């Protein structure tokens, strides 16, 4: 399947939050490592679907920053991305503190738990508004860079097309660029 043929559907944050809460609760209440591992497999499929939707929207926005639909989708994910990160972190904490951790480490590896430990140290829900602001500013910057129009030598170029002048063997042309 070609990238352009991949169907895009915006995630429903209410459904996403409900599913994260369900997975977290079921993981907490699991009666065995096997049960937690099966829930973990569901978690991986669920997060893969969420991430696919997010990535499709972001890539399509990067391809054409003037597309209003994907600009709105990008803005949406700038807002909800940190909230999703919070749920992923909550799930990670439950997994990390699992009484069945030895079994889980044998199934999914110790590196996963080291990554969870690092993520736990790096994330605090107090920074969600800052993460949202950072996402919005990064998107705005990317759009400015992508839509820059630079008059040069009687033509108008974007930044990527200016590269050929900036790397020209002609020193005077490089200086002007």
What is the predicted function of each stretch?
Residues 1-177:
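A well-structured
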């Amino acid at each position: 399947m070609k990238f352009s043929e991949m169907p895009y559907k915006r995630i429903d944050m209410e459904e996403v939050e409900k599913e994260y809460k369900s997975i977290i609760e079921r993981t907490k209440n699991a009666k065995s490592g096997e049960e937690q591992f099966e829930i973990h497999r569901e978690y991986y499929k669920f997060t893969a679907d969420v991430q696919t939707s997010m990535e499709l929207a972001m890539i399509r926005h990067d391809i054409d920053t003037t597309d209003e639909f994907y600009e709105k989708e990008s803005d949406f994910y700038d807002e909800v991305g940190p909230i999703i990160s919070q749920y992923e972190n909550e799930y990670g904490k439950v997994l990390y503190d699992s009484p069945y951790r030895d079994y889980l480490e044998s199934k999914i590896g110790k590196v996963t738990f080291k990554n969870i430990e690092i993520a736990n140290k790096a994330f605090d829900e107090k920074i969600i508004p800052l993460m949202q602001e950072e996402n919005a500013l990064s998107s705005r910057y990317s759009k400015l860079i992508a839509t820059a129009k630079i008059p040069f030598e009687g033509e108008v170029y974007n930044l990527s097309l200016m590269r050929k002048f900036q790397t020209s063997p002609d020193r005077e042309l490089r200086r002007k660029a």
